[in-house]
């Protein structure tokens, strides 16, 4: 099993090109099942979750061609299987995203209940409730969601999510584009990745209004065409590298980004004392060798501060000047990195969904274990600033969401390498 060896204490300097967003690429790849012709998706990151989605689409009968630049061509005209098996779905929660497209286009889908990061309860009940309201007959038995269309096709409805759900919004959005009539989704997720999916669907012929707001309206069409689409850049990867620059007191520029999707993070970096310069598709952060100031964080759905950046900011606050409060409102079990940061000398107290972080002068390298995707990123960041060697175990988690993270950090001056126990 691979692990990362990090010798910390070096300020990071330089530029890093940000990859395509995993959380946009996965639903877009799932949406290719809706098209009557082949689609070509570019700027797809080379990640384990992406490979899993490719395997899943292939299992369903889609034909995929991938070139050396990770341009992915999907032809779903020959789809002849309607079961998303446990062996694939268990490793990736986003596998649930094939449910809406399969149900809308083929009228049936059997999807194993999803897996992914062990960061608490992320039920699919909201997805199923909405699809049932649109006319689907759904049962859950032996670990599988068995969905069928009662009337041959889904019916447009007025839907209201009880809580904001990104994958739920995406699943229903994809189902609605081929439904009969108009579907209105209230309390819809506003994340940029939802907008990216909507733009992809619109390019293929879908009729969608309001993506990026809390109310999305979809007028169903008979079929979708093929097309070509470039996935948006990864705002969480961008924020992670900016955080690496901030906590090492360095200067880092992230390129090929959309600054408008980073506003909640950028405000907090400025509050921490960073000097920011923002261009059309890049952001430069410069700490001028200053220790960051502690910043308070409260996670919430977009456009508020992203839960996927909480762990990285906790690493920064661990070595910041002053004390901070971090409140996690999205997931109930997303502080699993705290115990590992404490092994490195971080001063953190937990009380329910709140962490109190007292910044210390330095962290000390230690063997630590990644427990989920973003927790692994926080441990790597902590290793970059710690004195001595940090060994991060179970980095298959980080490989699910960061493309070549050790190579990109090395280009910024980090002393980091991947080694294998094999």
Curated annotation (Swiss-Prot):
Highest taxon above the source species: Bacteria
Protein keywords: Cell cycle, Cell division, Cell shape, Cell wall biogenesis/degradation, Cytoplasm, Peptidoglycan synthesis, Pyruvate, Transferase
Gene Ontology molecular function terms on file: UDP-N-acetylglucosamine 1-carboxyvinyltransferase activity
Amino acids binding phosphoenolpyruvate: 22-23
Pfam family, one: EPSP_synthase
Entry EC no(s): 2.5.1.7
Record InterPro entries: Enolpyruvate_Tfrase_dom, Enolpyruvate_Tfrase_sf, MurA_subfamily, RNA3'P_cycl/enolpyr_Trfase_a/b, UDP_GlcNAc_COvinyl_MurA
Keyword Cell wall biogenesis/degradation: yes
Gene Ontology CC terms, in alphabetical order: cytoplasm
Active site: 117
Pathway annotation from the record: Cell wall biogenesis; peptidoglycan biosynthesis
Reactions accelerated catalytically: phosphoenolpyruvate + UDP-N-acetyl-alpha-D-glucosamine = UDP-N-acetyl-3-O-(1-carboxyvinyl)-alpha-D-glucosamine + phosphate
GO biological process: cell division; cell wall organization; peptidoglycan biosynthetic process; regulation of cell shape; UDP-N-acetylgalactosamine biosynthetic process
Location(s) in or outside the cell: Cytoplasm
Top-level class of the enzyme under EC nomenclature: transferase
Transit peptide recorded as keyword: no
Binding locations of UDP-N-acetyl-alpha-D-glucosamine: 93, 122-126, 308, 330
Record function comment: Cell wall formation. Adds enolpyruvyl to UDP-N-acetylglucosamine.
Family per similarity comment: Belongs to the EPSP synthase family. MurA subfamily.
Protein name listed in UniProt: UDP-N-acetylglucosamine 1-carboxyvinyltransferase
Organism encoding this protein: Legionella pneumophila subsp. pneumophila (strain Philadelphia 1 / ATCC 33152 / DSM 7513)
Lineage: Bacteria, Pseudomonadati, Pseudomonadota, Gammaproteobacteria, Legionellales
Underlying gene: murA
């Amino acid at each position: 099993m691979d692990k990362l060896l990090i010798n910390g204490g070096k300020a990071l300097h330089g530029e890093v090109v940000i990859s395509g967003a995993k959380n946009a690429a996965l639903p877009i790849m799932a949406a290719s099942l809706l098209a009557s012709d082949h689609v070509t998706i570019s700027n797809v990151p080379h990640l384990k979750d992406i490979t899993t989605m490719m395997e899943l689409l292939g299992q369903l009968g889609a034909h995929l061609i991938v070139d050396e630049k990770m341009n992915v061509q999907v032809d779903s005209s020959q789809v002849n299987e309607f079961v998303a098996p446990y062996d694939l779905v268990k490793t990736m929660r986003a596998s649930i995203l094939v449910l809406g497209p399969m149900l809308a286009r083929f009228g049936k889908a059997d999807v194993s209940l999803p897996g992914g990061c062990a960061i608490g309860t992320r039920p699919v009940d909201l997805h199923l409730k909405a699809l049932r309201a649109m006319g689907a007959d759904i049962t859950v038995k032996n670990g599988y969601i068995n969905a069928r269309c009662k009337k041959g096709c889904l019916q447009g409805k007025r839907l209201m999510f009880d809580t904001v759900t990104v994958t739920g919004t995406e699943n229903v959005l994809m189902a609605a584009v081929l439904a009969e009539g108009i579907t209105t989704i209230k309390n819809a997720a506003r994340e940029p990745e939802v907008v990216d999916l909507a733009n992809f669907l619109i390019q293929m012929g879908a009729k969608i209004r309001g993506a990026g707001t809390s109310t999305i309206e979809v007028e169903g069409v008979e079929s979708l065409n093929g097309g070509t689409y470039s996935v948006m850049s990864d705002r969480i990867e961008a924020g992670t590298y900016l955080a690496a620059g901030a906590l090492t007191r360095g200067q880092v520029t992230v390129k090929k980004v959309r600054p408008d999707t980073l506003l909640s993070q950028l405000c907090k970096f400025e509050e921490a004392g960073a000097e920011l310069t923002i261009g059309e598709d890049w952001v430069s952060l410069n700490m001028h060798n200053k220790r960051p100031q502690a910043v308070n964080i409260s996670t919430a759905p977009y456009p508020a501060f992203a839960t996927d950046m909480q762990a990285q900011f906790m690493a920064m606050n661990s070595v910041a000047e002053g004390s901070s409060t971090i409140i996690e409102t999205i997931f109930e079990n997303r502080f699993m990195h705290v115990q590992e940061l404490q092994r490195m000398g971080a001063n953190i107290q937990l009380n329910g969904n709140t962490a109190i972080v007292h910044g210390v002068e330095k962290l000390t390298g230690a063997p630590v274990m990644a427990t989920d995707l973003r927790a692994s990123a926080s441990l790597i960041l902590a290793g970059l600033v710690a004195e001595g060697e940090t060994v991060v175990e179970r980095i298959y988690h980080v490989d699910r969401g960061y493309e070549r993270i050790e190579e990109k950090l090395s280009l910024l001056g980090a002393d980091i390498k991947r080694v294998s126990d094999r």
